[in-house]
Amino acid sequence: MNVAVVGCGSLGGVIAVRLAGRQGLHLQVLNRNSLIAEAASRQGLRLRVGGRWSTARVPLLPAPSRGPYDAVILAQKANGLERTCRELLPALAPRGFFLTTQNGLAGLELVRAFGPARVVPSCVLWGASMTSPGVYELTASGPFLLQAGEASPLPEARALLSQIFPVRLCPDITAVLWSKLAISASFTALGAISGLRFGQLAASPEGRRMILAIGEEVFRAARAQGVELGELGGGLNARRFLQPAGQGGYPPTRKHLLLRLMGWKHRRTESSMLDSLRRGRPTEIDFLNGLVVRAAEQAGLPAPWNRAVCQLVGEMERGLLQPQESNLIELGRRATAMQAGHAR
């Protein structure tokens, strides 16, 4: 099986190390980051899982050189994802397919653009960080989620991903991706704004309040589009987690307890958006919180917390702000002002 991994950041690097050397699999990593390429050439790609290290030497190339590909795992940021697919489409084998790993709904957009025979969206429930170029740490274990079904290329995608981490099938990948968006838009954005790790965010009562406020706006935007959030695994029902307690949601004490447990599991995970800001790269804010704002607008719903997040991250992208914990105070001030303005 001829496989390409596009991107060698925290997700792509872990995927590459886990797939390297698998029997019957020819792996190629498409990467344009010169620091990662230099590190890989010097010492290979290195992955730490607990106290154990793995090293893989795989070719890192700036452009495809050996096709056709039976599978292309898209591990890059959502920015430019469709352009990447259009560039690589001629390099796919007749039954080849793209596998998406991004947060947000970018995978669903690609299914609409290229068809279900060419695109398999997945939901990633494990976490990783790139601690230095070409050096990775698995910060939280978990499976890939795929839509249940037998239509090709789903069995092939399942077989490939199961060589990396366990795969679970779900009845509705759209609901799962919206559910993951409710979590990632909160933790990822707040981690970028504050510079805090996920465990630090969830340990703070105010941090948990903000996580819930952002997630509740995602819940309302999804429901307005006819999507009911569902199970994410680990006992977390995203709908009940974000729905008001008086309408069938968990009581506030249980929500805060679940967040503390979630934060503990992902305590070492840093926001990928924070990494983009530190490197002076565009973030995925438009594909996460920006998507929520647009969906809420279409439904005539307010989304002050997600809108304020977009404002602050935009200012950080322009160099007007730096990641720091005090930014959370400004976020709360702006969101509260927007709420008051909408209520008038």
Where are these regions (language model features)?
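Internal alpha-helical scaffold of NAD(P)-dependent oxidoreductase catalytic cores
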Residues: 91, 113-118, 135-236
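Short active-site oxyanion
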Residues: 25-28, 69-72, 94-98, 143-144, ...
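Short, charged/polar "capping" segments at the starts of alpha-helices
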Residues: 35-39, 107-109, 153-154
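Rossmann-like NAD(P)(H) cofactor-binding subdomain of soluble oxidoreductases
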Residues: 52-137
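NAD(P)-dependent Rossmann-like dehydrogenase/reductase catalytic/cofactor-binding core
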Residues: 212, 216-219, 223-344
